[in-house]
Structure formats: structure tokens, C-alpha cells
Amino acid sequence: MRWIQESGFYRGTGDKMIRPAIIGWREWVGLPELQRAPLLSKIDTGAWSNTLHAADIEIIESRPESRIRFRLEEEGGWVERPIQRWRRIRDSGGHETLRPVIRTTIEIASRDFDIEVCLADRSTLKHRMILGRNFLRLGFIVNPSRQCIHTMIRSEERIEMGSMD
């Protein structure tokens, strides 16, 4: 049974209650199935879906499932994942594109989630990953005056992919 308390402060399934985490307009996230270093992600309340930068995208048609092969960085190693589905995305200019969707684990604010992520070439954009409203529904509130509220503890050095600050 899924419910939301009237005050909006708690969300839960069955007996488990989760207090929403406050996050900034951008946060460090972990993508343990895709790369080792944390990634600086923009929280985009104007977007519905999540999008991750992918370079050199190749579709591998096979049975029973199609797969996608891509790089997270131009010089990085290859990543291969099953394609969950294709999603039609409309950008702010009204242009529609069809994007492949994969599932992966994301770590943020000391929590892990299995999420869907659209893949697209974001090499010319400031942030290599955006998290949209469907992600925020998992139990997050955005404080637009703050950034990087939650740290990622990793032995590897942090990499701010694509940031032009």
C-alpha cells in the first residue's frame, strides 16, 4: 500500500516511512554500474525524465533484447546495457527526438535507487546528467538556493564532467 501523509512530509510503502531528503539544484551522484567516479548532476524541475550524456552510441540488435553500447566520456571505456524502451522527448524549442532508455542504479543523499535514464549527446551542455521530476517523486525536495548539499564518499577523485564553472 502506497500513501502520502497529508502534510506532505512523509512518503512510504506499507509500514516503511521515508522523510524526503532536501537536495540542492545540483548534487554529486554515484552511478556504480556505469562509472566509478561521482558525477555532478543538475536537478531539473522543468524536465520530466532523467538524461545522461552518452558518446559514440551504437545500437546492437539482438534477440531477445536489443542493447546499447556507448561511452560516458570521449576517451572512456565502453558501457553496454539492455535498452528498456524508447522515449519521445520534446526539448524547450518544441523539437522531438526519440531516445533510448536504460535502467541503472543511482546513489544520492545516502540512498540508492533503480532508475530509468534516457541517453543523449550532452557534450555541448554544462551538465552531463539531469534528474527530472520523475526522480524527485522518489522522495526529494529541491532547495534552489543550495547546491551540493550531500557529499559522495569515494576513494576515487571527483570528476565534474562537462562543467564550465
Please identify what each model-predicted range represents.
Residues R2-W3, G8-D165:
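Pepsin/retropepsin-fold aspartyl endopeptidases
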